[in-house]
């Protein structure tokens, strides 16, 4: 009855609850921001607390129904209930204990519970599950943070690796430039020994069949017919040619009997002299003095290196202090005009050219007129590559020569045939037919460094007697050198001890 008197009449009728309800609603509204910040794992705890708050309300309704009949006694105690109403309100307010709920929430949000505290406190299963889920979420967040840190480290490692690779990629060019500079310094030295060493390296493949390759053939043998047969076979393998080989063998046989040679190694020296005499007949450098302009007409088959040889010759003449002009007479091959123009741009040399497909004779005619007007020292005219067995193309070449003679009776002052040394005995056929068509006055032998068929130079020199002006032993401009028979023979027969 004491509890019933304390609650009062208005509380049984629900007046006290109406006054408490706004207060609870305001408190709940104030707690909503706090509750929204709580982790999802704490929702079961909130549900249990709400259930505890709803129990007093249900109990109050049951008691109200039980004492509804005793209205008379309640009316007599109105005065007492009015006095007790403030106390009831005071007592009813702390029952939900709403203010105490944020304290553990705030503690859990600011500081995570330690495992020792969890074990020491008696926690309900729902709270234990909520805390376990909270710990799992925190651990997952820490793992993600750790992964992010590892990712940053991996990124730094990757950046360092890329920087190292870039450093590695930058280093080799610097290492490669040093040998190039050293080679350039060696080339600048006009000493005979420097070029001789380079010539020996370029003739390594040819020396396998000629020159020093004969040492093993002659060593420890007697001079007899078997030795000459082996020598003849070796000369034919080196593309010296049948006629030139027979001539060499005949002269060696006569010389050996005349000098009464018995040692095969002595025959090796005699062979060197014999082959040196063949090349000495064609050792005649090109002289461009006395003519203005000195016109050089370049002829040859396709792909032997005419245009490249023109660019190298132009550079060498310019280094000698002569003014040079180029004529792009190869109007048939695609990009031939552009190729010659590139050589002109590299060396600051003027190039006379027309569109592709134009008449080659007209281009060269215009070039001769321009060279005379500008007082050019040397004019080098390019022509389209043509096979020696194409009669109509050879007739076109004759037409070019006739057109040139209209401006200068002595032009062209040099008709230079470019021969690829790797073609072997086909070079003999080229020299024969081009010589019959336009009358060759010089020969340039290219690509000697990449073939074992360099013996063709002896066949061409022996059969035609046309001066060999230049030999190409490499790709650089300096690798196109004036031909010197003595240097060539010495490099060919140099012994590798």
UniProtKB/Swiss-Prot annotation:
Matching CDD domains: FtsY
E.C. code: 3.6.5.4
Membrane topology label: Peripheral membrane protein
Location of the protein in the cell: Cell inner membrane; Cytoplasm
Binding site for GTP: 300-307, 382-386, 446-449
Cysteines joined through disulfide linkages: none
Keyword terms, alphabetized: Cell inner membrane, Cell membrane, Cytoplasm, GTP-binding, Hydrolase, Membrane, Nucleotide-binding, Receptor
Positions of the record's site feature: Cleavage: 14-15
Main location: membrane
Catalytic activity: GTP + H2O = GDP + phosphate + H(+)
Principal EC category: hydrolase
Any one biological process term the GO annotation gives: SRP-dependent cotranslational protein targeting to membrane
HAMAP family registered for this protein in UniProt: FtsY (MF_00920)
Domain writeup: Contains an acidic N-terminal A domain, a central N domain and a C-terminal GTPase G domain that can bind and hydrolyze GTP. Contains at least two lipid-binding sites. The first site contains the first 14 amino acids (helix 1) and the second binding site is an amphipathic alpha-helix located at the interface between the A- and the N-domain (helix 2).
Listed name of the protein: Signal recognition particle receptor FtsY
Source organism of this protein record: Escherichia coli (strain K12)
């Amino acid at each position: 009855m004491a509890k019933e008197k304390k609650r009062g009449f208005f509380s049984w009728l629900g007046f006290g609850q109406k006054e408490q309800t706004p207060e609870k609603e305001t408190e709940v509204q104030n707690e909503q921001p706090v509750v929204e910040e709580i982790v999802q794992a704490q929702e079961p705890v909130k549900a249990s607390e709400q259930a505890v708050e709803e129990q007093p309300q249900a109990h109050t309704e049951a008691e109200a129904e039980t004492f509804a009949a005793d209205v008379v006694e309640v009316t007599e105690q109105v005065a007492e209930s009015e006095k007790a109403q403030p106390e009831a309100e005071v007592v009813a307010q702390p029952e939900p204990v709403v203010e105490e709920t944020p304290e553990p929430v705030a503690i859990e949000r600011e500081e995570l519970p330690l495992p020792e505290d969890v074990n020491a406190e008696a926690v309900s299963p729902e709270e234990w599950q909520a805390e376990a889920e909270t710990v799992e979420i925190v651990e997952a967040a820490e793992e993600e943070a750790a992964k992010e840190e590892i990712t940053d480290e991996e990124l730094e490692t990757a950046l360092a690796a890329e920087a190292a690779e870039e450093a590695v990629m930058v280093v080799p060019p610097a290492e490669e430039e040093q040998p190039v500079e050293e080679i350039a310094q060696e080339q600048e030295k006009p000493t005979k020994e420097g070029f001789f060493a380079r010539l020996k390296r370029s003739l390594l493949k040819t020396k396998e069949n000629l020159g020093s390759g004969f040492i093993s053939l002659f060593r420890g043998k007697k001079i007899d017919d078997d030795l000459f047969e082996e020598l003849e076979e070796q000369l034919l393998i080196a593309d010296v040619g049948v006629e030139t080989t027979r001539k060499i063998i005949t002269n060696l046989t006569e010389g050996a009997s005349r000098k009464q040679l018995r040692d095969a190694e002595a025959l090796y020296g005699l062979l060197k002299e014999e082959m040196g005499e063949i090349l000495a007949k064609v050792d005649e450098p090109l002289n461009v003095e006395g003519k203005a302009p000195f016109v050089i007409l370049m002829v040859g088959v396709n792909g032997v290196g005419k245009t490249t040889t023109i660019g190298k010759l132009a550079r060498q003449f310019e280094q000698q202090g002569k003014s040079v002009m180029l004529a792009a007479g190869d109007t048939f091959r695609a990009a031939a005009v552009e190729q010659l123009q590139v050589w002109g741009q590299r060396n600051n040399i003027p190039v006379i050219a027309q569109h592709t497909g134009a008449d080659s004779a007209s281009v060269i005619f215009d070039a001769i007129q321009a060279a005379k007007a500008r007082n050019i020292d040397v004019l080098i005219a390019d022509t389209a590559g043509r096979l020696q067995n194409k009669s109509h193309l050879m007739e076109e070449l004759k037409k070019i020569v006739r057109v040139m003679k209209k401006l200068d009776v002595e032009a062209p002052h040099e008709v230079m045939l470019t021969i690829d040394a790797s073609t072997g005995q086909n070079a003999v056929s080229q020299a024969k037919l081009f010589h019959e068509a336009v009358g060759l006055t010089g020969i340039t032998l290219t690509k000697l460094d990449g073939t074992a068929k360099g013996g063709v130079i002896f066949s061409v020199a022996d059969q035609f007697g046309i001066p060999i002006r230049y030999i190409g032993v490499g790709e650089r401009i300096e690798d196109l050198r004036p031909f010197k028979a003595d240097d060539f023979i010495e490099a060919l027969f140099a012994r590798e001890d």
